[in-house]
Amino acid sequence: MAVWALGINHTTAPLDLRGRFAFAIDQIAPTLQGLRQSLGGATRHPQVETAILSTCNRTEIYCAGQQPALDHTLDWLAHSGGVSPSLLRSHSYTLEESLVARHAFRVASGLDSMVLGEAQILGQMKDAVRAAETAGALGTTLNQLFQRSFAVAKEVRTSTEIGAHSISMAAAAVRLAGQLFEDLTEIRILFVGAGEMIELAATHFAAKNPKSLAIANRTLERGEKLASRFGGEVMRLADLPDRLHEFDAVVSCTASSLPIIGLGAVERALKKRRHRPMFMVDLAVPRDIEPEVKALEDIYLYTVDDLASVVQTAQASRQAAVAQAEAIIDAGVQSFMHWMDQRSPVGGVVPLIQQIHAQADEWRALEIARAKKLIARGEDMDAVLEALSRGLTQKMLHGTLAELRAGDADTRAQTAQTVSRLFLRSQSRSGL
């Protein structure tokens, strides 16, 4: 079994390119079905395992199959994003075998994140695994890879201080707002969306006791739940253009495939505000706010990539924790590759074990069938059991005893040592 992966992230691709490959969680299942069909045709093995991890900072595809198909996987992803394979290749990374495990373990542990040590990525990876399971795209190999990723991430977090003093994207947004506004208790803030990222951002801003807080969302029910938690109001997304001018700060993160706050709406809001400054944070990928907005005077717009310098300020002091985490990951990679080697059809013990079990089950079925016939004829039960046990013993020992008599003296001596070790283990341990 081969494993391979490819992806783009905040270090290899700009925001707008990453936006072309962002998959909402409800898109994962049909997307995986299309990917598996495509890979099945390319590799002639329809049971290819696949999973997609898609966040604001990365989109990654993990695969397992009889033979790697990196080029075909890249071509498929390029087509899905509407770009040329050459463009995607120049902004992506491809991995095979142990490098896949190392990368997955580093991602789950927060070592590959924009925010070093952040814990949110682990939950996002678990969501990706659940989506793959629901789609029927996950098999033994990828399931093992991800379960080991979760175990390694847990050990990294409990054994190191990788997450200590980690500055989240939401906390970074609060810091930037504090640089623009003298007193955050005097600002009116609007959150667009009601997902996990907005919930985190609202938690950080609410701790500063702003003058007012509002949630704009497509569905009022979800928005009301979040607004009530922070003592804010809720509004429909459709009302956003008419009310945008009321807010000093706007934080947006939705799953929309197109911008929901356009240049014209912001220009009108600024005019109504008499050009008092507005602080805007776009945490969405693809963008929620048109990029042209950033060029407007009195607008301070930040994207997830703009926040990178803020969230990385505390990372240098955690390099010792990184070294400890990498050691844990090294051990995890070795363990996973050992598991893979055992399952290899060439030199792996798992296929041999499966064959031995299958042969033993065949012999058992034959002897049970023979015993049932004897019982049906009225044979003595003790005699039937004796015949059953002898039949099984003879079948299981026949090949071994034949090997002991085959070959020259040296071959027979080596075979005898092996057979003794396998069949007389209790005697050899006791010194008999």
Swiss-Prot record:
One Gene Ontology term of the molecular function aspect: NADP binding
Q: Does the keyword Protein biosynthesis apply?
A: no
Q: Which GO terms describe its biological process?
A: protoporphyrinogen IX biosynthetic process from glutamate
Question: Record-annotated residues binding substrate?
Answer: 55-58, 113, 118-120, 124
* Xref: InterPro entries: 4pyrrol_synth_GluRdtase, 4pyrrol_synth_GluRdtase_dimer, 4pyrrol_synth_GluRdtase_N, GluRdtase_CS, GluRdtase_dimer_dom_sf, GluRdtase_N_sf, NAD(P)-bd_dom_sf, Shikm_DH/Glu-tRNA_Rdtase
Q: Please list the reactions this protein catalyses.
A: (S)-4-amino-5-oxopentanoate + tRNA(Glu) + NADP(+) = L-glutamyl-tRNA(Glu) + NADPH + H(+)
Q: Which residues bind NADP(+)?
A: 193-198
List site positions: Important for activity: 103
**Per UniProt, which keywords does this protein have?**
NADP, Oxidoreductase, Porphyrin biosynthesis
Q: Where is the active site?
A: 56
According to the record's subunit comment, the protein's assembly and interactions are:
Homodimer.
Q: What else is known?
A: During catalysis, the active site Cys acts as a nucleophile attacking the alpha-carbonyl group of tRNA-bound glutamate with the formation of a thioester intermediate between enzyme and glutamate, and the concomitant release of tRNA(Glu). The thioester intermediate is finally reduced by direct hydride transfer from NADPH, to form the product GSA.
What does the UniProt record say this protein does?
Catalyzes the NADPH-dependent reduction of glutamyl-tRNA(Glu) to glutamate 1-semialdehyde (GSA).
Record's family?
A: Belongs to the glutamyl-tRNA reductase family.
NCBIfam families named among the record's database cross-references: hemA
Tell what the record comments on domains.
Possesses an unusual extended V-shaped dimeric structure with each monomer consisting of three distinct domains arranged along a curved 'spinal' alpha-helix. The N-terminal catalytic domain specifically recognizes the glutamate moiety of the substrate. The second domain is the NADPH-binding domain, and the third C-terminal domain is responsible for dimerization.
UniProt xrefs under PANTHER family: GLUTAMYL-TRNA REDUCTASE (PTHR43013:SF1)
Write down what this protein is called: Glutamyl-tRNA reductase
Q: Which organism is it from?
A: Paracidovorax citrulli (strain AAC00-1)
